[in-house]
């Protein structure tokens, strides 16, 4: 079944050939150790819904201080609640790539983008030990691009995937910061009765791991929880963050949008709502839904399911 390869790659980070691989997953060993004058547009911070200005002219190399978070760049979102000065994570460039407390010299400083967008910055030469590294580079007190051919820090996906929340309360989903710390701390909050885009990255041109395509992965939480409370590392027995009940996957390749949902193998928690993969104007490869604690449909097995959509949009409906 299509889903089985997808899940195996997501969990073990083994570079299997898959229709929609996830890249190195948050179950990686180093993650468990982590437990202990340009055009202006207006954006909205998904964590506190305050308006702020955004610059569309691209990020200038060596201008911003490392102590200054570039939240005037189009699509970039501050995550102050994580305690890294707005950054989603900071990695030391010392061969081990452990976490630093602040963006400082010789570190990679990663950042969140608003829903539907993905960061564009990571060093082309990645560690050979399976760790991924991402973000801007801090050198001599200034921030520098790690992908010089793209000065826009965030980019849109294909725009063909989203989440529709028909519940009365909000649901927060947390994207893995990848390549980077791989923490599940990139927030998307979907208010009841609304929808939000997913980052359906173009897998043919986005970051690849070991020569394999990668897609976006999300941790899906119970309803009524704020992103600040659940898009963080939890502890064994919790039902949020890396212990959230469910995972979503989204991506675009071979002219198709791919959506996947699966139980989080680390967690025994269950969601308090149901989910169905649907299409708006497209053709689904099969049926897939989660209801009353189990997966159902022509593409489902006991762990989850994967569906491709040709034409139109694909979405997760929460009900």
UniProtKB/Swiss-Prot annotation:
* Signal sequence bounds: 1-19
Q: Where mainly found? A: secreted
Look up the EC number in the record and give it. 3.2.1.-
Keywords of this entry: Carbohydrate metabolism, Cell wall biogenesis/degradation, Glycoprotein, Glycosidase, Hydrolase, Polysaccharide degradation, Secreted, Signal
Q: Name a Pfam family for this protein.
A: SUN
Q: What does this protein do?
A: Cell surface beta-glucosidase involved in cell wall biogenesis.
**Protein name, as recorded:** Probable secreted beta-glucosidase C2G2.17c
Which organism is this protein's natural source? Schizosaccharomyces pombe (strain 972 / ATCC 24843) (Fission yeast)
């Amino acid at each position: 079944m299509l889903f089985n390869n997808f899940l195996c790659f997501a969990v073990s980070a083994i570079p299997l050939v898959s229709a929609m691989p996830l890249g190195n997953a948050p179950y990686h060993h180093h993650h468990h150790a982590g437990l202990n004058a340009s055009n202006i547009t207006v954006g909205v911070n998904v964590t506190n819904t305050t308006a702020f200005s955004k610059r569309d002219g691209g990020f200038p190399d060596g201008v911003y201080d490392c102590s200054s978070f570039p939240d005037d760049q189009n699509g970039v979102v501050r995550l102050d609640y994580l305690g890294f000065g707005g950054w989603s994570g900071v990695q030391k460039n010392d061969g081990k790539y452990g976490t630093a407390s602040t963006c400082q010299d010789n570190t990679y400083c990663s950042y969140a983008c608003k829903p539907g967008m993905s960061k564009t910055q990571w060093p082309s030469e990645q560690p050979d030990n399976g760790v991924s590294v991402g973000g801007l580079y801090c050198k001599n007190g200034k921030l520098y691009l790690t992908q010089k051919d793209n000065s826009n820090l965030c980019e849109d996906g294909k725009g063909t995937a989203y989440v529709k929340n028909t519940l009365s309360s909000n649901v927060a989903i947390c994207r893995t910061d990848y390549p980077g710390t791989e923490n599940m701390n990139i927030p998307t909050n979907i208010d009841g009765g609304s929808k939000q885009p997913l980052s359906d990255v173009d897998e043919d041109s986005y970051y690849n791991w070991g020569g394999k395509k990668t897609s976006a992965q999300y941790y899906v939480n119970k309803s009524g929880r704020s992103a600040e409370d659940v898009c963080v590392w939890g502890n064994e027995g919790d039902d949020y963050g890396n212990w959230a009940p469910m995972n979503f996957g989204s991506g675009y390749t071979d002219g198709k949008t791919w959506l996947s949902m699966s139980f989080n193998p680390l967690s025994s928690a269950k969601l308090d709502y149901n989910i169905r993969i649907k299409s708006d104007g497209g053709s689904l490869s099969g049926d897939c839904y989660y209801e009353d604690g189990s997966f159902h449909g022509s593409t489902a097995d006991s762990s989850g399911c994967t569906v491709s959509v040709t034409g139109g949009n694909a979405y997760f409906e929460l009900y």
